[in-house]
Amino acid sequence: MSLPKKKIGIFAFFLLTVFTITLKTYFSYYVDFSLGVKGLVQNLILIMNPYSLIALVLSVFLFFKGKKAFWFIFIGGFLLTFLLYANVVYFRFFSDFLTFSTLNQAGNVESMGGAVSASFKWYDFVYFIDTIIYLAILIFKRKWLDNRAFSKKFVPVVMATSVALFFLNLAFAETDRPELLTRTFDHKYLVKYLGPYNFTVYDGVKTIENNQQKALASEDDLTKVLNYTKQKRTEPNPEYYGAAKKKNIIKIHLESFQTFLINKKVNGKEVTPFLNKLSSGNQDFTYFPNFFHQTGQGKTSDSEFTMDNSLYGLPQGSAYSLKGDNTYQSLPAILDQKQGYTSNVMHGDYKTFWNRDQVYKHFGIDNFYDATYYDMSDDNIVNLGLKDKPFFKASADYQSKMKKPFYSHLITLTNHYPFTLDEEDASIDKPNTGDSTVDGYIQTAHYLDQALEEYITDLKKKGLYDNSVIMIYGDHYGISENHNNAMEKLLGEKITPAKFTDLNRTGFWLKVPGKSGGVNKEYAGQMDVMPTLLHLVGIDSKNYLMFGSDMFSKQHNNVVPFRNGDFITEDYKYVNGKIYSNKDNELLTEKPKDFDKNKKQVEKDLEMSDSVLNGDLFRFYKNPDFKKVNPGKYEYKSGPKGNEKK
């Protein structure tokens, strides 16, 4: 490389760094982030939003002199690039953006190494090529740099321009998306309108506000929530109320399961033949085909949290990680106090993942059968932990010896991203979509279906089937929007935002002893499971704070809110600010009569649930029907025998 005729000055290096980082951010918008950008205004906003914070941050280093200025600008640029790339990798895996809250979950990343590494792409060098070039110049081609001081009078101009551009950006954003900063349920909106860097600043401010909320919370805040949830309560259905009193409850978590798999064939073979039978209505199970997950960033942990507490997860981060030491009125604790149930969770991963070993104590869960209770030899492990077949087999053995009635929650793992399976376990050919994630998903889902069938057979052999409520559900979507092209090949139809919402159906199957099965087409979500189960065992939900409604109730609320503020009803869905018909997923030209009421209810639900978590409001609840859980009572010893409740 020959010496350039004109050296690179400090200000020129600053402009070059701002330009290349901004360019990389544009690249991420269109290649990696699914932001749903439409129209001239939104594209103009994308052009503006990265520049303001990049320029403002890096302009601070213009006050330094000589080599220091070059190096500080470089380091600042590298940190911004690292933040961008971290968001890219995180988005590929979670379809969401990094927050300060998710940093508290960083310990989970080590356990998910294979899944995270699968998120890397061949073109990722684009995000670092400028950084490498600048570093090479700073180390090996210092003669190219002009270290002479330049007039600092330009620096305040740059800063003022950056701030002015931010407010102009915000004005455009508020015009296109009113109340953007007050209705902040969806991070994609915030990044689309503010950019990833301003979003990080905004998230930091919100995190501080939420931390202050607990200190300022009072019993009056709880009263407001109680008054609201009591108005939402639905009466139990007399036909089902108490039908399963003191029966065992077995809750089976199907990792990443989506119901587009039901009755789906690949190369002429059913992907989920056993679940297909359970979905027919001719078995012991009632199938809810319009059951949706309601998780946020916490994914699996949000699913557990919502179904055991009838509360929403957090808008940022995982409630397990951030609110694990709160006071709760959980389903396992209520079952114990009202009907003497023992409770346990069974999972082929280690107990510290998702902070479970601490959270479960606050839920009043008696026993935790983690990976130390299972044979974790190499032949039994794939992806994140224990394969489903040996997991189910060992779990059934443990359950056959449990004190009854018990509440047992089994969490599977094999059908987890990146959906890899040992050759000897694969018994269905992969489709050929050209996407290893989608193709692998078919094989791992088929394996999960086989494992589930073997487990149900074991329950029958061990005499547990007839006297147990058995609940099966998918915890969250498995295939994100990043794989829409492959999904279109697999399903043979266009994946629009409305269709992707339909794909968030994760299924719910429920066997109640003494009741025949069927198909229940009510629209419901994970929030509704807790009141449904309480009524089945004969415990009235009226004395407990819950946001869901009994799925068997004749007054069941068919509005299903999502964590980002979208929602779906029997007739239409609200997605990314637009309303679509459920019949054909076409955009509605007229607003439904009940739309404003439903939208207000969804926003109020999310707001109230957030206040419960951020204010730790259950600590103020004096409920004569519930004694607060003492987490100090619980200890989860390592296997093989554990600490079983006698």
UniProtKB/Swiss-Prot annotation:
Processing after translation: Proteolytically cleaved.
GO cellular component: a single term: extracellular region
Pathway connected to this protein: Cell wall biogenesis; lipoteichoic acid biosynthesis
Enzyme nomenclature, EC number: 2.7.8.-
Superkingdom of this protein's organism: Bacteria
Active-site feature positions: 300
Record-listed substrate binding positions: 416
Extracellular topology ranges: 29-43, 90-119, 175-646
Gene3D superfamilies tied to this protein: 3.30.1120.170, Alkaline Phosphatase, subunit A
Transmembrane parts of this sequence: 8-28, 44-64, 69-89, 120-140, 154-174
Topological domain spans for side Cytoplasmic: 1-7, 65-68, 141-153
Major localization listed first in the record, in broad terms: membrane
Record-linked InterPro entries: Alkaline_phosphatase_core_sf, LtaS-like, OpgB/LTA_synthase_biosynth, Sulfatase_N
Site entry: Cleavage: 217-218
Positions contributing to Mn(2+) binding: 255, 300, 475-476
Membrane topology per record: Multi-pass membrane protein
Subcellular location: Cell membrane
Keyword Chloroplast among record annotations: no
Record protein name field: Lipoteichoic acid synthase
Organism: Staphylococcus epidermidis (strain ATCC 12228 / FDA PCI 1200)
